[in-house]
């Protein structure tokens, strides 16, 4: 999933630590939401939502419908600004490769969104449906349920999910540090080769 270059969301800045927008960006996003809300009900229905996501992302229609159903958990056929804001932060986190950080910082709201039945557990099938939002590969998903399903019921409760987000974020940070270190070593090596000649 990618944001389309030049769309409104492309110009918003997501804080890399907390995965939130600045007050100025939230104000601009609220204004954008009110422009999209042609019915003046402070909500977006499924048609408006589809056209918005189709305009700003490369998601397919089925994926957009899945996302709408996830956000419209009480099945009223509309989403309000709070859910819209969460979606935009999710999209920006995905665009900036901060999916793990987003899940860690917002573990409770993410868990509640993925808990479709409201029974305080996330099944593998539910997570599979939404893994494209968080850039989780199939093997990672299998490993997640194998390693963190402590109760053994093939469903994650909130504590298991939170533990996963902590360890996942830690792994990502270690991987990024290793990549930065290797990149620095390559630059030093290239620099020294240039100066030897």
Swiss-Prot record:
What keywords are assigned to this protein? Calcium, Cell projection, Cilium, Cytoplasm, Flagellum, Metal-binding, Repeat
The gene coding this protein = EFCAB9
Q: What does this protein do?
A: Auxiliary component of the CatSper complex, a complex involved in sperm cell hyperactivation. pH-dependent Ca(2+) sensor required to activate the CatSper channel. Sperm cell hyperactivation is needed for sperm motility which is essential late in the preparation of sperm for fertilization. Associates with the CatSper complex via direct interaction with CATSPERZ, and senses intracellular Ca(2+). Together with CATSPERZ, associates with the CatSper channel pore and is required for the two-row structure of each single CatSper channel.
Biased-composition ranges, Basic and acidic residues, are 177-188
The organism of origin for this protein: Homo sapiens (Human)
Q: What is the protein named?
A: EF-hand calcium-binding domain-containing protein 9
For the biological process aspect of GO, one term held by this record is: sperm capacitation
> Per UniProt, where does Ca(2+) 1 bind?
58, 69
Keyword Chloroplast included in the entry's annotation: no
């Amino acid at each position: 999933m990618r944001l389309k270059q030049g769309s409104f969301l492309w110009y918003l800045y997501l804080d890399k630590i907390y995965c939130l927008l600045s007050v100025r960006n939230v104000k601009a996003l609220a204004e954008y939401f009110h422009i999209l809300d042609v019915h003046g009900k402070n909500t977006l229905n499924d048609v408006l939502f589809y056209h918005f996501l189709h305009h700003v992302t490369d998601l397919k229609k089925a994926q957009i419908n899945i996302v709408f159903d996830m956000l419209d958990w009480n099945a009223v056929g509309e989403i309000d600004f709070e859910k819209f804001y969460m979606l935009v932060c999710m999209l920006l986190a995905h665009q900036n490769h901060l999916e793990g950080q987003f899940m860690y910082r917002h573990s409770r709201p993410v868990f509640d969104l993925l808990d479709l039945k409201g029974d305080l557990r996330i099944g593998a099938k539910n997570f599979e449906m939404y893994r494209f939002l968080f850039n989780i590969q199939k093997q990672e998903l299998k490993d997640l349920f194998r390693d963190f399903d402590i109760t053994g019921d093939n469903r994650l409760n909130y504590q298991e999910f939170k533990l996963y987000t902590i360890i996942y974020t830690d792994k990502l940070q270690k991987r990024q540090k290793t990549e930065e270190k290797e990149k620095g070593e390559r630059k030093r090596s290239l620099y020294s080769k240039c100066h030897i000649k």
